[in-house]
């Protein structure tokens, strides 16, 4: 079925499934609020210094349920490093006025953060110090919870120590007054020593599954950043939203309601390659790949002379190519983004979706990808899950 026209059938099928179940069991249909999904947004503090600048004043709070304010940094001894410019009192004030919960996100990509988490989680004393410092920060500035982004456990005991750390955080931030979440990879067992997802589930309100970065500078060919489905043409069979969702619900046994599925507001540009699955020069993509935002860098190229937009019909992923100089860009557009919402929320009934990151589709005037997500939530007829 073409990826440009399948969303409404999912909405009808979802309602029909609920209706049949109700008739068979004699129960009434659930109201929207009981099954309404979340829409979460990672908001990086440094977005204000990007071009175009994106601050808390640009955030359309009515189009999301939660904000994850990224990132403050952990230290090996359990302290917190607060970047200069991180604090935005208006963010908390305006979000709360709109009924949006804000969690502080700690960590992020980078070996330094992973090493800090590894060391601070290794002993009861440093775990306690970390939890104490996080608790003080949340209380002082009025956050509604904490999100941990540990990418990824690498030391032999990290998997066990990560579980102990999350248990301590959950004890300090009880539900429903506070929310505790984790950003987790699409394939946890392929990331360092792995994460004990089944046991971690008892200590988090939800997981944010990072279903993007299926391709990048580490690849040897130009692949797809965040495909909905696994393409049979992918030489490495690196995965997709669907394979990650099946892994978490099937292998790990996690409830769909506890899972938020990610989408990317950025793409990857491969220089020296002009076809999907084309090999990078000299057998490595390390020096030919650039991360570029949708709003400021990718959107202006769509329809521009010399560029061709195509859709991988096997995966649902759009991409741009140029012949001279040879260039390939993997990204998501409004249609592929809406299609993900229709599949994740409408067809599969997962707990929510999120994006990395909220500023990525801002073009100085609007946010096409966020609008596509929000519009699809409205098409599905759901409000946001109770905050």
Model-derived regions: residue spans:
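Bacterial N-terminal signal peptides
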Residues: 16-27
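Short, well-ordered coil/turn segments that N-cap beta-strands
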Residues: 37, 63-65, 98-102, 142-144, ...
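Glycan-recognition patch characteristic of GH18 chitinases/ENGases
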Residues: 34-138, 284-286, 367-383
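Active-site groove signature of glycoside hydrolases
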Residues: 131-159, 209-213, 354
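Glycan-binding loop/region signatures in secreted carbohydrate-active enzymes
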Residues: 63-64, 224-226, 258-343, 370-387
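Conserved, mostly hydrophobic/aromatic
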Residues: 67, 104, 148, 169, ...
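Bacterial N-terminal signal peptides that target proteins for export
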Residues: 3-17
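Substrate-binding surface in catalytic domains of secreted glycosidases
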Residues: 76-86, 152-297
